[in-house]
C-alpha cells in the first residue's frame, strides 16, 4: 500500500492559517473601527393645536349599549 506524501502539507497549511488569521483580524478591526453613534436626545416640539388640549367628543366602545 503506498504511503501518503505529506511533505507539502506544512507549505500549504502555514499560509492558510496566516491568511485566516489576517482575515479574522481585519474583520475585527473593521467592526470596531466605527463605534455606533449615541442617540441624540431632543425634546419633542409642541405644536399649537387649534382645537385645544381637551377632547371634543367621547365615544363608547361598541360592546356597551348607549347610555342616555
From Swiss-Prot:
Superkingdom per UniProt: Eukaryota
Positions carrying N6-acetyllysine: 54, 57
Keywords assigned by UniProt, alphabetized: Acetylation, ATP synthesis, CF(0), Hydrogen ion transport, Ion transport, Membrane, Mitochondrion, Transmembrane, Transmembrane helix, Transport
Statement: the UniProt record of this protein carries the keyword Transmembrane: yes
Any single GO CC term annotated in Swiss-Prot or TrEMBL for this entry: mitochondrial membrane
Stored InterPro entries: ATP8_mammal, ATP8_metazoa
Any Pfam family hit: ATP-synt_8
Modified residues (N6-succinyllysine): 54
Gene Ontology molecular-function annotations: proton transmembrane transporter activity
Topology in the lipid bilayer: Single-pass membrane protein
TM ranges: 8-24
Subcellular location per the Swiss-Prot or TrEMBL entry: Mitochondrion membrane
GO biological process assignments: proton motive force-driven ATP synthesis
Statement: the UniProt record of this protein carries the keyword Transmembrane: yes
Family in the record: Belongs to the ATPase protein 8 family.
Summary of the function given for this chain in its UniProt record: Subunit 8, of the mitochondrial membrane ATP synthase complex (F(1)F(0) ATP synthase or Complex V) that produces ATP from ADP in the presence of a proton gradient across the membrane which is generated by electron transport complexes of the respiratory chain. ATP synthase complex consist of a soluble F(1) head domain - the catalytic core - and a membrane F(1) domain - the membrane proton channel. These two domains are linked by a central stalk rotating inside the F(1) region and a stationary peripheral stalk.
Oligomer and partners: Component of the ATP synthase complex composed at least of ATP5F1A/subunit alpha, ATP5F1B/subunit beta, ATP5MC1/subunit c (homooctomer), MT-ATP6/subunit a, MT-ATP8/subunit 8, ATP5ME/subunit e, ATP5MF/subunit f, ATP5MG/subunit g, ATP5MK/subunit k, ATP5MJ/subunit j, ATP5F1C/subunit gamma, ATP5F1D/subunit delta, ATP5F1E/subunit epsilon, ATP5PF/subunit F6, ATP5PB/subunit b, ATP5PD/subunit d, ATP5PO/subunit OSCP.
Protein's UniProt name: ATP synthase F(0) complex subunit 8
Amino acid at each position: 500500500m503506498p504511503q501518503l506524501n505529506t511533505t507539502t502539507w506544512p507549505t500549504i497549511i502555514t499560509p492558510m492559517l496566516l491568511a485566516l488569521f489576517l482575515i479574522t483580524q481585519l474583520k475585527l478591526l473593521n467592526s470596531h473601527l466605527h463605534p455606533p453613534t449615541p442617540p441624540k436626545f431632543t425634546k419633542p416640539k409642541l405644536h399649537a393645536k387649534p382645537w385645544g388640549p381637551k377632547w371634543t367628543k367621547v365615544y363608547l366602545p361598541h360592546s356597551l349599549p348607549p347610555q342616555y
